[in-house]
Amino acid sequence: MRILPCTPPWLRLALSLALSFTASSGFADDLNDHILSLRERAEITDQILEDRLETVVPEVMRAAGIDAWVLIAREYNEDPIVKTMLPATWLNARRRTVLMFIDQGPELGVARMAVARYPVGKLFPGVWNPEQQPDQYGRIAQILDEANPARIALNYSDVYALADGLTYSEQRDFLQALPIRLRDRVVSSEAVAVGWLETRTAAEMATYKTVMEIAHRIIAEGFSSDVITPGVTSTEDLEWWFRQRVNDLGLQTWFHTSIEVERSDRSKQEIAANNLDPNLLLRGDHVHIDFGISYLNLQTDTQQ
């Protein structure tokens, strides 16, 4: 993971809102009071996304020697990279959504645009009018022909699944529409796509502290006597408690929680001798959790 060092001034208010935890010991009050509403989350994630598009994209494109990056996604069949570039009000691609980045040099920067029926929020202005030019791929080809990029990146890769979101039919139609002189300039976007995914801005790292704090608070609650009754609560009960708790807080898990119990050989023998259920949590057990939440477009992965 790479980290970009600067935090834009306009993000300070949003970050102070996200990081407003108190030192109170009440699990439920703390978490419910400090989980942001969907609208508040959208404000923060959209600002972070805009910052990433303006800083991360130019850096990774230039590092990889890419002059144009074309991302194509169809409704109901999402490209995983496109999904990370959509604003909060866009849950998915609409019809065929094409996002384009064209490097115009250090002075003009990297232009971004949407060759789609609609602008993609305020982040990608629309550059296609279907009424005037019904051929969407024709419009894409026209833009690239005028820009004359030396290297055009598409999301296909033999190595990285997340950089391989372009479908066969979309790649075929794109290449057919592209001027012949540009076709041999098409390359895999894997260096750019992976760079985009692995890079975190300073604003994201500041926000991540809050996300981790929430995850640790949930774990502490789940490991408390408020939740676990020795000899009654099973590992499966606890796994589902965590899943339900995250859902009740308005958050998401990105994998099912795993609970494992580590015991001495003597304890295992006593459990077997007394015909006890080995899946029940007992006094003296060493309980291990693998747990992750999704919040503010960031994911945790905690083993404890």
Language model region names:
Residues 1-4, 21-35:
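Basic/polar N-terminal segments that are highly enriched at the extreme N-terminus
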Residues 2-14:
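Bacterial N-terminal signal peptides that target proteins for export
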Residues 12-22:
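Bacterial N-terminal signal peptides
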Residues 27-224, 235-247, 275:
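A composition/biophysics-driven feature that prefers long, compositionally simple stretches
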Residues 101-107, 262-264, 282, 295:
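Short acidic-glycine loop/turn motifs at beta-strand connectors
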Residues 181-187, 252-258, 275-304:
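Short, acidic (Asp/Glu-rich) active-site segment that either coordinates a divalent metal cofactor
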Residues 199, 228-229, 281:
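Hydrophobic beta-strand core residues of beta-sandwich domains
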Residues 262-272:
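Short, structured beta-strand/loop micro-motifs enriched in basic residues and often containing a Trp
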